[in-house]
Amino acid sequence: MSTREIRIATRKSALALWQAEYVKARLEQAHPGLLVTLVPMVSRGDKLLDAPLAKIGGKGLFVKELETALLDNEADIAVHSMKDVPMDFPEGLGLYCICEREDPRDAFVSNRFSSLDALPAGSIVGTSSLRRQAQLLARRPDLQIRFLRGNVNTRLAKLDAGEYDAIILAAAGLIRLGFEERITASISVDDSLPAGGQGAVGIECRSADSEIHALLAPLHHTDTADRVVAERALNKHLNGGCQVPIACYAVLEGEQLWLRGLVGQPSGGTLLMADARAPRASAETLGVQVAEDLLGQGAAAILKEVYGEAGHP
């Protein structure tokens, strides 16, 4: 294969740059002599930090500019946090690589309290996620949830300034940025089911670029990919493209996938849960099956209410 340059479109946040540098290093390791460069960009989601994601269009805000760069041939691949990747791709683009997953759990971070259960009634907890909010309030309705956006450093600084008693972040982001010691406690997936794809990094590129597909192949982690395919299929069947209180998490048990799904009212008043098992080759079908179970329990009404509040269909 001819040596060529690969240009990586990435957001400018510290975590996005870490992920892009990780992919760059993996590509250079797999293909000595390959020139890999970063094309940092500012996404609309990075500019609009004063409103909840659900109200400004959801997580697709973080990828649109990167996709435009791919379509305009200003970059060859785009590196994303899988939990930020919308279900559908523009014509001519697709997801061609999913890297090995980091810790998928949510992390409890506090300077004063050792765990969620140790928080006194009325404590202020920061999160930007309706998924986390729904599960937190279902478990601890006596807590106050306060909106929290910004990059990891900004969120930690707000905690350190005393604006919150605790904040909830993805463990993977803290670990990757070297803040693992800030994790007061990792929250079990039984207590806070993660977002689909949480902890995994995905690589998007042009569908017709077979040479790039071949270069990416050594980075693809099949065990992670099968799990994420099931999670994304559940999300897609629930039309979970926006920032909504949907959680899903798949694990491999030998050659079987076990998928758990959850839809909750942001108030925590109702949490709907479903799970099922299937051969890993049926990952997508499994996602649809668990989503159908949730719909049968009334998930559509909860999601419609949330979409209505966010101003989306």
UniProtKB/Swiss-Prot annotation:
What's the Enzyme Commission number for this chain? 2.5.1.61
* UniProt keyword annotations, A-Z: Porphyrin biosynthesis, Transferase
* Gene Ontology cellular component annotations, sorted alphabetically: cytoplasm
Q: How is the cofactor bound?
A: Binds 1 dipyrromethane group covalently.
Q: Does the keyword Transferase apply?
A: yes
Q: Does the keyword field hold Transferase?
A: yes
Q: Which Gene3D superfamilies match?
A: Periplasmic binding protein-like II, Porphobilinogen deaminase, C-terminal domain
Q: Which GO terms describe its molecular function?
A: hydroxymethylbilane synthase activity
**Family to which this protein belongs:** Belongs to the HMBS family.
Miscellaneous note, as given in the UniProt record, is: The porphobilinogen subunits are added to the dipyrromethane group.
This molecule's function is given as:
Tetrapolymerization of the monopyrrole PBG into the hydroxymethylbilane pre-uroporphyrinogen in several discrete steps.
Quaternary structure, per UniProt, is: Monomer.
Q: What is this protein called?
A: Porphobilinogen deaminase
Q: Which organism is it from?
A: Pseudomonas putida (strain W619)
